[in-house]
Amino acid sequence: MKLNVTIEIPKKSNVKYEYDRKTNQISVDRILFGTEVYPHNYGFIKEALDWDGDELDALVIADQSFLPGIIVPAKIIGAMEMIDDGETDTKLISVIDCDPRYKHINNLSDLGEHTLKEIQNFFETYKLLQNKKVVIKGFKDSAWATKEYNECVELMKKYGKMDKDEFVNKMKKEHPEKYKA
């Protein structure tokens, strides 16, 4: 599956930017509390609402680092299921789709085990100094990622104008299985 990902955070940055759907702007949310930096470009899929009330997140693996707000064509190769401080926070995993160096990568196994371990390690540790708990439930294939994307597109259509906290509370009641670690 090929999608456009809007970059929030460049690769190797320790600045946590956040997109605000109401203002349509990206702003600085915080500086990461520790020494961690994002291992890959990090962004979102504008038309898809994840179960945490934010746009569906996506990592874009590329040699380059892209500025916040830039749209990058990406090939989705899988996903990482994650619970962040009690909320579902799925990360689609993709590679840049306009660089011939990445044309051979079609699934997570093409990345290699070490790259996946780096991604998992970053997300397991980047909030430790904030005393927030992150649970990685595991990696999923591209078919699972496509299904999750389609589900999140439907959530955006139905609930995209709803307040974030109201949405999360409603979803926790209606779909408690989505919030279990």
Curated annotation (Swiss-Prot):
Catalytic activity: diphosphate + H2O = 2 phosphate + H(+)
Keyword Metal-binding: yes
Annotated positions binding Mg(2+) 2: D57
Annotated residues for binding of substrate: K16, R30, Y42, Y126
Keywords, sorted A to Z: Cytoplasm, Hydrolase, Magnesium, Metal-binding
GO cellular component, one term: cytoplasm
Reported cofactor(s): Mg(2+)
Binding residues for Mg(2+) 1: D52, D57, D89
Sample GO molecular function, one term: inorganic diphosphate phosphatase activity
The EC number(s) this enzyme carries: 3.6.1.1
Class of this enzyme: hydrolase
Hydrolase is among the record's keywords: yes
Cellular compartments annotated: Cytoplasm
GO biological process: phosphate-containing compound metabolic process
Primary residence: cytoplasm
Pfam families: Pyrophosphatase (PF00719)
Complex formation: Homohexamer.
Described purpose of this protein according to its UniProt entry: Catalyzes the hydrolysis of inorganic pyrophosphate (PPi) forming two phosphate ions.
Family: Belongs to the PPase family.
Protein name, entry field: Inorganic pyrophosphatase
Gene behind the chain: ppa
